[in-house]
């Protein structure tokens, strides 16, 4: 019965519409989510839903999703929405799977972006000078401005996240700027000082001239940039006789680093040769007679760049010859500063893909340069070559006095523009006859993700945590027990979702350098240690537990501002103030802050009592800690948290790490305001509701990059509409259900038992998908079940029974019982995804049960409904039904019938089918007024014009018009209409229904 029945009043004179048991519900067809959702949020808050969840789950194993802190700066964007919705789906589904699933939201509050905002809004825009951070009062005042700014945006974002339907401990979030957090961050740093891995060193770091700070890898983006390129001759001064008067040629895209050159790297795996220029233009930098050492595979391209007309190879140059050779610096003689020897070092990083086959090595300006220099430092010192790395560029991007002849020349200016250093160096090379060629190269170059300006590698005093130094525990260092070794081991015992995340972070940890944790800024947790210079460039760190305790207690009471107060050094050092200890002024990298959140959230029972007593599986317990962020956090929060926890606790802070992709527009492009292709979550919520965003998140494969835009959201809305209509129909139908009339499973008709079997299959699929964080499967499976199996099949078939059968009908009661069981399961399964819609429906479905669907568990006892034999039988029945439906469509298209109730199909079945489906009510299943079956035996054949489907060619159908009179109540055309004297215009079934309706007081309720 595909349409809602109306009585044929014109034919019979009787209006039976009020006697039908039609759906009745206050659950509206139009969702009105933008208006309804805030009401539900208010209800959740008033009932303290998060508190009730914790109370109901007391004693269960914990599943803690530890929130990766967003930055407290600006309104949330679609990436935030994706991330927070995913987290909420995790926590809600894990709670409903039977865990105590806590969620404490948090914020990252320190760092340069907020400093920039304060400087811009409170100083630059008003023409005021930037505060002098060496002045105690000034830096504390500035830090208070930063704190207020972060607090403002924390509160804005909190409301925006709540509007997404995210349930958490919003009244007690964590923030890295909270006093207790700052105190614990300082304590975590002190642990690295105590275990011997914290050190101050000289090392090239990525430096933002514009921002005046070192940058972590996660803070760098690669953009197109045009660099000056030079091919430079380094004269061989000692070595094999065959290379006398020759020059080693290097190629670089950073001429300004040449004053910092201390070596040349080559590869013993590359073939090199000695080449002679035999013809070149008179005014050329490459002269006739020049002897040049080059990689054989690159010689042709070098000579072409150098405008050499002709050249010849004189001889091969072996690795032993190169290793024994030493060069002079190409700037030798300039300001008396380049008279040192330049050795040749064998390095694995050298290739002959481009350049000359030799790498100009400036250990203060490149990571690989630094690594090969330090690897050879002891041997170089033995040869009388100083291994000291110069500081050739200062924080302003200007060359220093350690770059003689170029002091004050700028690599990059304060605006991030290219300075005059490159040209000055190039002209000096030309003047000394050391330049072979020059050019320009457009390539990918590192830029700060904040300022969008190019960065440089420069040698600076920074604070580091060693990756490969044996960690001291109780005064003893165990050989091989390094931070890198611990981290790699921890990665191997962590669950990564998707699994590819393991290889990604494993590769990053395997190859990463020591962790630079210092920044030269004002808004952050200070590197709260005291030091003394040791005279060799290194420092001694004060190890005094009493001093450390004073610092931590002060931070707990006053925040980290206490470090900058007047007299702070004397206050913390106490009776050690006269020993010459200096207070470090650098602050910690914000990645160290966020990497320490496990310490001041998951382990702080005083401030977060709901998280007290976590005992993870790694400790023999049953609790689980998950981290969930975008895939970029393999080098960000996952990475820093892993290093921090492994360095202080010997293990990862998490058991499961789940990553999602980035959000793109409908064409797969990165979103940007300039392109006008952004999707504002606030606008989507205002127009369609947060549940639409939630459905979009869960319907996509979050492991990959997701797309969103108007057309995609339109499809999501359509999917939602279908799901909502199914829910609405069930709620309306169950208006007539009384649970004390529930029918036992064994007494149900086959169709109901089939649907409960399918529900049991859904239960297994949905539970497994939720357990595996596979929300795309949850949505796809439920949508298919609700749209295809329920709405288009079961509900359609059972509408006649539900609307028209007498209240005493077993079939009707069984159908209502089945729909009740289905509705209960579906609302619970949808709750983590459609949190508002499911809870609104639940309040109407079970007003006498739990006050929120989120306080329930997923159904556990559906497995008892499995009946694989019945399902197999109905696979055949439904195949036959498809043939009948196809035949009806042909008749409808030809306008020979209107409704399927006007038809009486003749179904021709092979004899082999009858053993399985002999007892089927085909009229009921096919929603026709009547149906006949004819068994084809032996050589019997159906009429030639019978309808068939290729996939079931043994079945044929001929559609005839139904014979009889149209029932004024059910619309069925039956010969039995008129057989009941009291109700002559309806069928006997409908007559009985009318009598029972009348006995009930004339109400279909």
UniProtKB/Swiss-Prot annotation:
Which annotated residues bind ATP? 673
| Principal location class | cytoplasm
Record localization: Cytoplasm
What UniProt keywords apply to this chain's record, in alphabetical order?
Aminoacyl-tRNA synthetase, ATP-binding, Cytoplasm, Ligase, Nucleotide-binding, Protein biosynthesis
* Known EC number: 6.1.1.5
Residues annotated as binding L-isoleucyl-5'-AMP are: 629
Summary of subunit composition and partner proteins: Monomer.
Q: What is this protein called?
A: Isoleucine--tRNA ligase
From which source organism is this entry?
Rhodopseudomonas palustris (strain ATCC BAA-98 / CGA009)
Q: What is the lineage of its organism?
A: Bacteria, Pseudomonadati, Pseudomonadota, Alphaproteobacteria, Hyphomicrobiales
């Amino acid at each position: 019965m595909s349409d809602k029945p109306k009585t044929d009043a014109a034919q019979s004179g009787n209006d039976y519409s009020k006697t039908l048991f039609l759906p009745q519900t206050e659950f509206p067809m139009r969702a009105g989510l933008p208006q309804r959702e805030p009401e539900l949020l208010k209800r959740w808050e008033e009932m303290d839903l998060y508190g009730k969840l914790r109370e109901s789950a007391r004693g269960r194993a914990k599943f803690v999703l530890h929130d990766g802190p967003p930055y407290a700066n600006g309104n949330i964007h679609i990436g935030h929405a994706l991330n927070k919705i995913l987290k909420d789906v995790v926590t809600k589904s894990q709670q409903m799977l039977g865990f105590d699933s806590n969620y404490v939201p948090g914020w990252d509050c320190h760092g340069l972006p907020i400093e920039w905002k304060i400087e811009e809004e409170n100083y630059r825009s008003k023409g005021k000078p930037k505060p002098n951070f060496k002045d105690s009062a000034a830096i504390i005042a500035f830090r208070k401005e930063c704190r207020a700014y972060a607090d403002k945006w924390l509160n804005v974002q909190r409301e925006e996240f709540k509007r997404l339907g995210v349930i958490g401990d919003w009244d007690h979030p964590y923030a890295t700027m909270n006093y207790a957090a700052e105190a614990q961050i300082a304590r975590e740093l002190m642990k690295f000082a105590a275990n011997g891995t914290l050190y101050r060193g000289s090392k090239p770091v990525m430096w933002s001239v514009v921002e005046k700070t070192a940058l972590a890898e996660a803070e760098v983006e690669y953009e197109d940039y045009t660099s000056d390129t030079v091919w430079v001759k380094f004269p061989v001064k000692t070595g094999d006789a065959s290379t006398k008067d020759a020059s080693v040629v290097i190629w670089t895209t950073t001429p300004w680093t040449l004053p910092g050159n201390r070596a040349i790297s080559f590869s013993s795996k590359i073939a090199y040769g000695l080449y002679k220029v035999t013809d070149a233009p008179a005014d050329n930098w490459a002269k006739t007679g020049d002897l040049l050492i080059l990689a054989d595979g690159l010689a042709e391209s070098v000579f072409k760049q150098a405008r050499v007309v002709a050249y010849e190879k004189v001889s091969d140059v072996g690795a032993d010859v190169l290793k024994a050779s030493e060069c002079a610096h190409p700037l030798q003689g300039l300001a008396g500063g380049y008279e040192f020897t330049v050795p040749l070092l064998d390095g694995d990083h050298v290739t002959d893909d481009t350049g000359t086959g030799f790498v100009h090595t400036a250990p203060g300006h490149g990571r690989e340069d630094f690594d090969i220099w330090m690897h050879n430092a002891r041997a170089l010192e033995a040869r009388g070559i100083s291994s000291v790395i110069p500081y050739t560029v200062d924080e302003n991007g200007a060359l220093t006095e350690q770059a003689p002849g170029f002091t004050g020349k700028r690599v990059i200016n304060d605006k991030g523009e290219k300075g005059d250093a490159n040209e000055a160096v190039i002209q000096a090379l030309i003047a000394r006859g050391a330049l072979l060629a020059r050019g320009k190269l457009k390539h990918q170059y590192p830029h700060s993700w904040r300022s969008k300006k190019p960065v440089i590698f420069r040698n600076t005093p920074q604070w580091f945590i060693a990756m490969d130094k044996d960690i001291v525990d109780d005064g003893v260092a165990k050989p091989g027990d390094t931070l890198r070794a611990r981290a790699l081991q921890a990665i191997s015992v962590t669950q990564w979702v998707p699994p590819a995340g393991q290889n990604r972070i494993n590769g990053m940890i395997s190859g990463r350098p020591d962790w630079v944790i210092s920044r030269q800024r004002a808004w952050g947790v200070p590197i709260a240690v005291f030091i003394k210079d040791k005279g060799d460039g290194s420092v001694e760190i004060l190890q005094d537990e009493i001093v450390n305790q004073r610092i931590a207690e002060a931070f707990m009471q006053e925040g980290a501002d206490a470090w900058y107060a007047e007299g702070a050094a004397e206050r913390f050092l106490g009776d050690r103030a006269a020993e010459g200890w200096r207070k470090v002024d650098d602050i910690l990298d914000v990645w160290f802050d966020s990497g320490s959140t496990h310490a001041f959230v998951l382990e702080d029972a005083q401030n977060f009592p709901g998280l007290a007593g976590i005992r993870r599986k790694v400790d023999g317990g049953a609790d689980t800690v998950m981290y969930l962020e975008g895939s970029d956090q393999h080098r960000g929060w996952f990475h820093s948290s892993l290093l921090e926890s492994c360095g202080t606790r010997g293990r990862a802070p998490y058991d499961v790490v789940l990553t999602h992709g980035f959000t793109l527009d409908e064409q797969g492009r990165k979103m940007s305001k300039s392109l006008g292709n952004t999707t504002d979550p606030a606008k989507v919520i205002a127009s369609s509701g947060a549940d639409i965003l939630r459905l979009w998140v869960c319907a996509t494969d979050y492991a990959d990059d997701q797309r969103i835009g108007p057309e995609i959201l339109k499809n999501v809305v359509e999917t939602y509409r279908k799901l909502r209509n199914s829910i609405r129909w069930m709620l309306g139908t169950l208006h007539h259900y009384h649970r004390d009339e529930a029918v036992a499973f064994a007494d149900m008709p086959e169709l109901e038992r089939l649907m409960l079997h399918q529900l049991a299959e859904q239960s297994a699929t949905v539970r497994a998908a939720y357990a595996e964080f596979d929300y795309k499967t949850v949505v796809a499976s439920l949508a298919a079940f609700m749209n295809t199996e329920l709405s288009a099949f079961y509900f359609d078939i059972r509408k006649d029974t539900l609307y028209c059968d007498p209240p005493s009908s077993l079939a009707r009661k069984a159908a209502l019982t089945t729909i009740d069981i289905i509705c209960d399961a579906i609302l619970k399964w949808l709750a983590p995804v459609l949190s508002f819609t499911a809870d609104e429906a639940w309040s109407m479905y079970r007003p006498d049960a739990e006050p929120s669907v989120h306080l329930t568990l997923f159904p556990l006892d559906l497995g008892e409904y499995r009946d694989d034999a019945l399902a197999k039988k109905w696979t055949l029945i439904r195949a036959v039904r498809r043939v009948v439906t196809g035949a009806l469509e042909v008749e409808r298209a030809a306008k020979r019938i209107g409704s399927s109730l006007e038809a009486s199909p003749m179904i021709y079945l092979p004899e082999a089918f009858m053993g399985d489906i002999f007892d089927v009510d085909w009229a009921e299943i096919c929603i026709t007024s009547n149906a006949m079956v004819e068994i084809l035996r032996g050589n019997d054949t159906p009429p030639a014009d019978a309808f068939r489907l290729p996939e079931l060619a043994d079945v044929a159908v001929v559609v005839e018009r139904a014979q009889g009179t149209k029932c004024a109540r059910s619309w069925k055309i039956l010969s039995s209409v008129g057989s009941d004297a009291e109700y002559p215009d309806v069928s006997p079934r409908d007559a009985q229904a009318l009598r029972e309706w009348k006995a009930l007081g004339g109400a279909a309720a």
